[in-house]
């Protein structure tokens, strides 16, 4: 019995899950085939005088009716006829419409000369956030209107909208086909919407801001402006509703995408299943096809039609669902479109060549070469079932993939003449992953050119599990050996595994995708960033004598990480810019994690060896080893311990955590494990005594535990964290317990028999002060990273006195939002009578609604002379001075 037969029988017995995947994949593939049939006149560039639609009767038949509605065509419909999706056009031309450095006046000057519906995304200096500037028709009065873009944790949305998206591109693409809170849908510039290939889009993108004043920004002679919906409830006029009623029964009617702006809450939504992101091509060798039925035409002839699309399967919930979006939502599949010839008969779509897949990375090419023997499984079996047909859906025509480019060879984009015919017109709006569900808003296409790579099918499960801390990154120029195996998985099994791994990949957050993208960029020596990182890593590994001490080496690495992070935040090598994918208050966090993976991961082994050599050379480890043995022989009371200590089992648990810490390269993750150890020690102390303990009691217990673990490597681990941890994390619990661990080790190093290990020596205290000053005073400019996300606010009432609460306040939350939080926390009945005040230097200053309390707090902390200040929530009429603080950059001491 062959291996393939055994695998197939195994799937029959245990593969009900795979069978379900096959069924859903087949239905979605057929759905997409039906959805992408465009009008012949549209493909020829002609504007139809009237629109035909297929109306389903209650007896199951279809008839053709004229649609008298004339709505303005949205950008999505134009993109279908031009073989490129809206998302593709937005991604390739973002240097044109994404102008974050543009001021309000410059944006208004650009849009004044544009037709209604054209837009720009820039950053407003007044609102301190990104805005969508939209050109309005004359009947609206004002020529422009700005819509603020709200940035939450890794999502983007318009102010007032309940729909969130993973990045700006999907947000703009959605509003090109649905208006939601906008007065009408967005429109792409004429040159962008009519471009036929990616090469043309890239040529336009090279103009950047000059595109708006160039001849390329040409408009058609009679471009109709976008219209508002004719009714507020989002339903088309009564004449159109009558077409949907046959014998008093509602019928299912297919609609063109241009009608989507007339159907808001009751209209068709775009559906995407993250399991399947590619349109399944038809089997040219006579595979299974959906049975077609014949319906009598109006003139008595029969015409072939496909059955109506089946309802889509339920959407997969995201792992990180926004609370306001975690509600039940109904998703309707996009209606199918049918081609008509001039005689009114339905024209069957012609078979078009299947597109050749783009060049893949080397590791993918080797993986696909190994599949060569299994590619002809379905081709050699005329009666192959649907499973085998799905197995070859991803490999069009059995054509081999193109050769992968070299390390520094960039394949030029194919021209429109040499590009093979693709299914650009067949790419439905659902391919943009647009939906009102949070799972779709957080989902990225794996084949999307956003990050310039395709996910490796061999390591999809590893990508889902996140970053691997227990291995060091391989050198960037290391050939991957092909694994030889006596058993080759059949194409069927590989296809199923790829689909399942695609689900795991779709669950990755934008943060992890960006970190992985930056890590790939750091290994690309064709980029300046890649050369910078690789040259520095090679220099450190080859020149071990360039540092005089362990502290000097770690400080140099930290300084390089900070400089590279600053370069990357301003560089154009991240295309598209990181601001369009990650909210501003999370950019530094994402870049810091990327630096850990790009720099610290390949240097982990080298840094560990160098730290060990330094401490062995200066004799500190020898002294530490002797003192550890001496401390272990003492009773806890002799060490100044008067609280319960962990038993042998708890000490072993702590030792396992310390050993796990050694395998990690990220200082942030090391600190998280250290916090778990400290929490475990505190739990043992409190549970065994029934009372709370402070820091004076905790330090001797921590010293005792470290001595019992007997690990010399803890010395280098703590030094590693203290020098490489991001300074913004030194102000919280991580920095506090990190200094506690350093103090415990200092007590062991300086342990004397006649002295209890309870108090730190003056030398250790001075060392900690110098370390804290060195790590924190270099950040002179106040930043959103210099403070915690908490704000202490006092509530003052005439009768009840003053009380206070600690509120969770993000850096970009305004005073108006803080007042709303205070009104809820303090249970104020008339919040309009209250406001937030700043009390500093014996003066009261009422904060304006558009100021940022956390930025004010950071600026006060960064001053050379410390100021005592308080945020007070109190009645406005009790303000004796009536001083309004308008700007966070003004002098806080002037009244």
UniProtKB/Swiss-Prot annotation:
Which SMART domains does the record match to this protein? RA (SM00314), VPS9 (SM00167)
Q: Where in the cell is it found?
A: Cytoplasm
Q: Which UniProt keywords apply?
A: Cytoplasm, Endocytosis, GTPase activation, Phosphoprotein, SH2 domain
Recorded hits in SUPFAM superfamilies, A to Z, give:
SH2 domain, Ubiquitin-like, VPS9 domain
Reading the lineage from the top rank, the first entry is Eukaryota
What biological-process GO terms show up in the record?
endocytosis; positive regulation of endothelial cell migration; positive regulation of endothelial cell-matrix adhesion via fibronectin; positive regulation of vasculogenesis; small GTPase-mediated signal transduction
Composition-biased stretches (Polar residues):
328-338
Q: Where is the composition biased (Pro residues)?
A: 306-315
One GO MF term, please? GTPase regulator activity
Limits of the Ras-associating domain: 787-878
For the VPS9 domain, which residue ranges apply?
Answer: 618-757
Does the record's keyword annotation contain Protein biosynthesis? Answer: no
* GO CC terms, sorted: cytosol; endocytic vesicle
Q: Where does the record place the SH2 domain?
A: 97-190
Q: Could you tell me what this protein does?
A: Ras effector protein. May function as an upstream activator and/or downstream effector for RAB5B in endocytic pathway. May function as a guanine nucleotide exchange (GEF) of RAB5B, required for activating the RAB5 proteins by exchanging bound GDP for free GTP.
Query: What does the subunit section of this Swiss-Prot or TrEMBL entry state?
Result: Homotetramer; probably composed of anti-parallel linkage of two parallel dimers. Interacts with Ras. Interacts with RAB5B, with a much higher affinity for GTP-bound activated RAB5B. Does not interact with other members of the Rab family.
Entry's disease: MACS syndrome: A complex disorder of elastic tissue characterized by sagging skin and occasionally by life-threatening visceral complications.
State the name under which the record lists this protein. Answer: Ras and Rab interactor 2
Q: Origin organism of this chain? A: Homo sapiens (Human)
Which gene name belongs to this protein? Answer: RIN2
């Amino acid at each position: 019995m062959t291996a393939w037969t055994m695998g197939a029988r195994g799937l029959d017995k245990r593969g009900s899950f795979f069978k379900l995947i096959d069924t859903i994949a087949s239905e979605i593939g057929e759905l997409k085939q039906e959805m992408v049939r465009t009008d012949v006149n549209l493909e020829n560039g002609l504007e139809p005088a009237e629109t035909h639609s297929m109306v389903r009767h209650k007896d199951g038949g279809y008839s053709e009716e004229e649609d008298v509605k004339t709505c303005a065509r949205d950008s999505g419909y134009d993109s279908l006829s031009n073989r490129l999706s809206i998302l593709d056009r937005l991604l390739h031309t973002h240097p044109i419409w994404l102008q974050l450095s543009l001021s309000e006046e410059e944006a208004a000057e650009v849009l004044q000369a544009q037709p209604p519906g054209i837009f720009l995304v820039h950053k407003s200096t007044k609102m301190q956030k990104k805005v969508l500037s939209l050109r309005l028709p004359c009947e609206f009065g004002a020529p422009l209107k700005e819509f603020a873009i709200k940035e939450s944790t890794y999502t983007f949305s318009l102010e007032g909208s309940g729909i969130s998206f993973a990045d700006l591109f999907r947000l703009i693409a959605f509003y090109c086909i649905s208006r939601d809170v906008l007065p009408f849908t967005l429109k792409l510039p004429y040159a962008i919407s009519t471009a036929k290939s990616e090469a043309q889009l890239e040529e336009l993108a090279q103009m950047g801001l000059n595109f708006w004043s160039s001849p390329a920004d040409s408009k058609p002679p009679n471009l109709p402006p976008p219209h508002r919906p004719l009714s507020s409830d989002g339903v088309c006029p009564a004449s159109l509703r009558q077409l949907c009623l046959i014998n008093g029964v509602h019928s299912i009617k297919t609609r063109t995408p241009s009608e989507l702006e007339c159907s808001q809450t009751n209209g068709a939504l775009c559906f995407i299943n993250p399991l399947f992101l590619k349109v399944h091509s038809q089997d040219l060798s006579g595979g299974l096809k959906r049975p077609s039925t014949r319906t009598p035409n109006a003139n008595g002839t029969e015409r072939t039609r496909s059955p109506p699309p089946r309802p889509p399967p339920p959407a997969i919930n995201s792992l990180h669902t926004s609370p306001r979006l975690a509600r039940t939502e109904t998703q309707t599949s996009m209606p199918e479109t049918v081609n008509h010839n001039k005689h009114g008969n339905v024209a069957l779509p012609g078979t078009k060549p299947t597109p050749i897949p783009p060049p893949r990375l080397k590791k993918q090419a080797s993986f696909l070469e190994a599949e060569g023997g299994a590619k002809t499984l379905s081709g050699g079996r005329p009666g192959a079932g649907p499973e085998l047909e799905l197995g070859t859906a991803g490999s069009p025509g059995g054509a081999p993939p193109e050769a992968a480019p070299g390390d520094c060879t960039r394949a030029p984009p194919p021209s429109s003449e040499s590009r093979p015919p693709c299914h650009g017109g067949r790419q439905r709006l659902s391919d943009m992953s647009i939906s009102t569900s949070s799972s779709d808003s957080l989902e990225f296409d794996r084949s999307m050119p956003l990050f310039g790579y395709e996910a490796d099918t061999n390591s999809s499960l590893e990508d889902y599990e996140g970053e691997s801390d227990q291995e060091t990154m391989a050198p960037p120029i290391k050939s991957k050996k092909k694994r030889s195996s006596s058993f080759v998985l059949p194409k069927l099994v590989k296809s199923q595994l790829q689909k399942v791994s695609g689900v795991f990949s779709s669950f990755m957050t934008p943060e992890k995708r960006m970190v992985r993208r930056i890590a790939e960029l750091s290994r690309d020596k064709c980029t300046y960033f890649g050369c910078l990182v690789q040259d520095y890593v090679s220099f450190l590994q080859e020149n071990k004598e360039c540092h005089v001490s362990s502290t000097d080496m770690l400080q140099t690495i930290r300084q390089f990480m900070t400089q590279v992070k600053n370069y990357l935040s301003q560089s154009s090598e991240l295309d598209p810019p990181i601001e369009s994918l990650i909210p501003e208050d999370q950019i530094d966090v994402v870049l810091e994690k990327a630096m850990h993976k790009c720099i610290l991961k390949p240097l982990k082994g080298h840094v560990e060896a160098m730290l060990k050599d330094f401490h062995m050379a200066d004799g500190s480890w020898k002294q530490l080893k002797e003192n550890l043995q001496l401390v272990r022989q003492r009773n806890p009371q002799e060490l100044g311990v008067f609280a319960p200590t962990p038993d042998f089992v708890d000490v072993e648990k702590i030792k396992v955590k310390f050993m796990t810490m050694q395998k990690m390269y990220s200082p942030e993750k090391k600190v998280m494990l250290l916090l778990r150890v400290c929490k475990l020690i505190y739990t043992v102390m409190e549970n065994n005594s029934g009372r709370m303990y402070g820091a004076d009691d905790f330090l001797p217990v921590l010293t005792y535990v470290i001595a019992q673990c007997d690990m010399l490597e803890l010395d280098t681990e703590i030094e590693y964290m203290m020098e490489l941890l991001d300074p913004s994390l030194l102000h919280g619990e991580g920095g506090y317990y990190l200094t506690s661990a350093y103090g415990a080790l200092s007590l062991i190093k300086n342990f004397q028999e006649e002295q209890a290990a309870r108090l730190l020596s003056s030398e250790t205290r001075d060392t900690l002060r110098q370390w804290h000053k060195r790590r924190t005073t270099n950040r002179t400019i106040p930043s959103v990273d210099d403070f915690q996300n908490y704000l202490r606010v006092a509530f003052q009432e005439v009768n009840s006195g003053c009380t206070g609460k600690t509120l969770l306040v993000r850096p970009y939350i305004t005073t108006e939002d803080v007042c709303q939080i205070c009104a809820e926390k303090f249970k104020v009945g008339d919040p309009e009578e209250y406001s937030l005040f700043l009390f500093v230097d014996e003066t009261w200053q009422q904060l304006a609604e558009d100021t940022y309390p956390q930025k004010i707090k950071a600026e006060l902390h960064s001053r050379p002379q410390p100021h005592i200040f308080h945020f007070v929530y109190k009645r406005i009429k009790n303000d004796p001075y009536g001083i309004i603080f308008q700007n966070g950059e003004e002098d806080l001491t002037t009244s």
